[in-house]
Amino acid sequence: MAKKIIGFIKLQIPAGAANPAPPVGPALGQKGVNIMEFCKQFNAKTQAEAGMITPVVITVYSDKSFTFITKTPPAAVLLLKEAQLKKGSGEPNRNKVGTVSREQVRRIAELKMPDLNAVDVAGAEQMVMGTARSMGIVVEN
């Protein structure tokens, strides 16, 4: 018989750096998940891309066991990395903080493709360009 799902937990954790401190500990503790076991498994799975923010969806079952799926880093984080910035603009319509090339946008779109609801890479590029625009990053042709 299949296990009964009692909940989902969505978190964004730096890859390879999960620890029982907030926000991970309290979120998992509420559902009764073994926090250290999750941290060990997550860190082992994500150690290759250490430091990048990694979204994770944790499925918690009635017997307090869990499974998790890691997703690709948010487009905003990838754009900041490509543009070599610390953060986006506070006023993106007035202050532009950096630039990225169309080729960099294409690379990000191809990387994000499994997690986006775009039909093709061109649609994914448009989504990434919209994120860049909202962060005050200019996309050059």
UniProtKB/Swiss-Prot annotation:
Recorded GO cellular component terms are: cytosolic large ribosomal subunit
**Single annotated GO MF:** structural constituent of ribosome
Which Gene Ontology BP terms does the record give? Answer: translation
InterPro entries this protein is in? Ribosomal_uL11, Ribosomal_uL11_bac-typ, Ribosomal_uL11_C, Ribosomal_uL11_C_sf, Ribosomal_uL11_N, Ribosomal_uL11_N_sf
Which keywords fit this entry according to its UniProt record? Methylation, Ribonucleoprotein, Ribosomal protein, RNA-binding, rRNA-binding
Q: Does the keyword Nucleus apply?
A: no
Write out the PTM section of this UniProt entry.
Answer: One or more lysine residues are methylated.
Superkingdom, according to UniProt? Bacteria
Oligomer and partners: Part of the ribosomal stalk of the 50S ribosomal subunit. Interacts with L10 and the large rRNA to form the base of the stalk. L10 forms an elongated spine to which L12 dimers bind in a sequential fashion forming a multimeric L10(L12)X complex.
Q: In UniProt terms, what function does this protein have?
A: Forms part of the ribosomal stalk which helps the ribosome interact with GTP-bound translation factors.
Q: Describe the family membership recorded for this protein in Swiss-Prot or TrEMBL.
A: Belongs to the universal ribosomal protein uL11 family.
Q: What is this protein called?
A: Large ribosomal subunit protein uL11
Which organism's genome codes for this protein?
A: Chlorobium phaeobacteroides (strain DSM 266 / SMG 266 / 2430)
